[in-house]
Structures are given as structure tokens and as C-alpha cells.
Design a protein with these regions (language model features):
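Short hydrophobic alpha-helices and adjacent helix-cap/hinge residues
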Residues: 1-329
Length: 329
């Protein structure tokens, strides 16, 4: 072999070696950080999001990895948990509901953040507008304040003799602006319907018994729940206490009614959380949160549980049942 050919051969082999080595290196799996306000065992919305990922072909441990963080309803822990996800250098943060979304936004302005189930994204300061978020945050909204008056009207129609309505809410979940909007909508609807309101706060499931005892003591005729991640994710416990208190209630999601609650009016929340996964998919394919509009639900379900109505000795008007999307008999 001539010296020139030998040098060319060695040079070509040396150049090809790094390419071959690189080809053999496994591709880095995208790392998703999830931030939940709830305990690990209360994960209805997270499960729906993970199913959405699987539907899109993202299988944990095969082509994606997930770092999970849970705040156990201690909302003051969320900033610390969000900062930990940032230190882990996750590729995207998925926050379930507004409080984790705010904590993630304060922790980073560069890592993409997808928030599932926001109440009022603009009012809570998470996005500049629904059409153009203009930051590193986007996601889905279930539309919070606007539906409260509708629920109160349905409750009054179902129980025409009701005069005093207990309102259960979770303090600190939303911004002062959004909470003021919810209160304004509720009080305005109550005045129109001739109802008196009894506002009761619950910081966590441990407050349920005391809150419902106050409702019974003060003679509440029915119950309205403000939308809240804590109340939604603890829906079985809420329904159980309401049933034992013999208090008819209207809720923001059908899961309550499936568990034995009286009525619900709102978006299909599991479907909304599954849709949240599509944002992650688009971001992994190069889209920026600033260019992805916040998605609003296009359909709202009205569900009535007639078994619960009978147990409470309530005669739901046939005109109301005719408008229900589903009646559980």
C-alpha cells in the first residue's frame, strides 16, 4: 500500500469513528416535570394528562421521563417544588390548576409551562391573552367565574323553596382579582334569585366536617361549590359529607354526580386534562407557549342524579330534567 493511500485510509477511519460513536449514543429522552397541589394518592387530573400523553405515543420509561411533585394541599410548598423542577432542568413543566401554574411561572421565565385547568388565565396573570399568551405559559381553562351564576340558577330551579345557599370555597387558590369576580358573580345572581348566601372556607379536606356542621347549624337549604382543584380532586369526600348532611348541592364537574352528588354543570375536566398533553407534544415538536392559544371548553355538561334526588326527597321539575345532558336513574 502506498503511503498516501495509507494516510487517507487512516484519516477516513478517524473521521468516521466519531460519527459512528455518536450514532450509537442513545437520544436523550424528553423530561417532563409535573406539579400537583394534591397528595400523590389524589391524582385524577394527573392520570388523565398521562393518558393523553400515552395516546400521543409518549410512554414513560421508553421515550419520555417524568419527574412528579406533590404539595399535599400545602400551597406554600409549591414555590419550593417548582424551583426543584427547574434545578432538575426539565424540558417542560405541566402544572395542574392555577396555584402550581403561578408557582412555576415565578420559578422560571424560560422553561415552557403548560397549565391544565386554569380558572381565569388572564385575571390570574398567567397569560397576556387567551389568543396570544406572550410568555412561557399556556394551557387549558375550564372557565371559572362565568359559570357560577348559571349553577346557582339551576340549583334554585331544582329546589324552588331554597332560600339560604351555603357556598364552599378554597382560599388562596386564585388571585384576588379572580376571587373577587367569583364573589361578584355569585352575589349578583343571589340578589336576582332572592337568595341569601353563607360563605364557608376550607383550606383542606380536614375542614370539611366543620364547614358542613356550620351549614347545618345555620340552616342552609343547599350547597354551591366554587371551582377549586382541592374540592375537585377530593370529590368523593365532598360528596360523602354532603350526603351525610342531607344537603343537596350543585358541582362544577360530573365526577361529583357519578359519586352520588345531586347535580353538576361544567366542562368535562378529564377530557380537558387529556387535551393538555397536546400542548406538550407541540412544544416538543418546536412550538413556543407564547404562540399556542389557551384552549377553552366548547361544551358544558348538565348532569342530574335522580337516585340522590329521591334519597333527599326532592322532586326535580321535569322541565329541568328535559334540559339535562344526562340523568342518572
Amino acid at each position: 500500500m502506498r503511503r498516501r493511500d495509507f494516510i487517507t485510509l487512516i484519516g477516513g477511519a478517524a473521521a468516521a469513528w466519531p460519527l459512528a460513536a455518536r450514532a450509537q449514543q442513545p437520544q436523550k429522552m424528553p423530561l417532563i416535570g409535573t406539579l400537583m397541589p394534591s397528595p400523590v394518592e389524589v391524582s385524577t387530573s394527573l392520570d388523565a394528562f398521562l393518558q393523553g400523553l400515552r395516546d400521543l405515543g409518549y410512554i414513560e420509561g421508553q421515550n419520555s421521563a417524568i419527574e412528579r411533585r406533590f404539595a399535599d394541599w400545602k400551597l406554600d410548598r409549591l414555590p419550593e417544588l417548582a424551583a426543584d423542577l427547574v434545578r432538575r432542568n426539565v424540558d417542560v413543566i405541566v402544572a395542574v390548576s392555577t396555584p402550581p401554574g403561578r408557582a412555576a411561572q415565578e420559578a422560571t421565565r424560560t422553561i415552557p409551562i403548560v397549565v391544565g385547568g386554569m380558572a381565569d388565565p388572564v385575571g390570574d396573570g398567567l397569560v397576556a391573552s387567551l389568543a396570544r399568551p406572550n410568555g412561557n405559559v399556556t394551557g387549558t381553562t375550564f372557565i371559572g367565574p362565568e359559570l357560577i351564576a348559571k349553577r346557582l340558577g339551576l340549583l334554585k330551579e331544582a329546589i324552588p323553596g331554597a332560600a339560604r345557599i351555603a357556598v364552599l370555597w378554597h382560599p388562596g387558590v386564585y388571585s384576588e382579582y379572580t376571587m373577587a369576580q367569583m364573589l361578584h358573580e355569585t352575589e349578583a345572581a343571589a340578589r336576582t334569585l332572592g337568595l341569601e348566601l353563607q360563605l364557608l372556607a376550607a383550606q383542606g379536606p380536614g375542614d370539611f366536617d366543620e364547614a358542613f356542621a356550620a351549614m347545618r347549624r345555620d340552616g342552609a337549604d343547599a350547597l354551591l361549590l366554587f371551582p377549586s382543584p382541592m374540592l375537585y380532586l377530593e370529590y368523593r369526600r365532598v360528596v360523602d359529607v354532603a350526603k351525610s348532611s342531607r344537603l343537596p348541592a350543585i358541582y362544577a364537574a360530573r365526577e361529583f354526580v357519578d359519586a352520588g352528588g345531586l347535580m353538576s354543570y361544567g366542562a368535562n375536566l378529564p377530557a380537558l386534562f387529556r387535551r393538555t398533553a397536546t400542548y406538550v407534544d407541540k412544544i416538543f415538536k418546536g412550538a413556543k407557549p407564547a404562540d399556542l392559544p389557551v384552549e377553552q371548553p366548547s361544551k358544558f355538561e348538565f348532569v342530574v342524579n335522580l337516585q340522590t334526588a329521591k334519597a333527599l326527597a326532592l322532586d326535580i321539575p321535569s322541565t329541568l330534567l328535559a334540559r339535562a345532558d344526562e340523568v342518572i336513574e
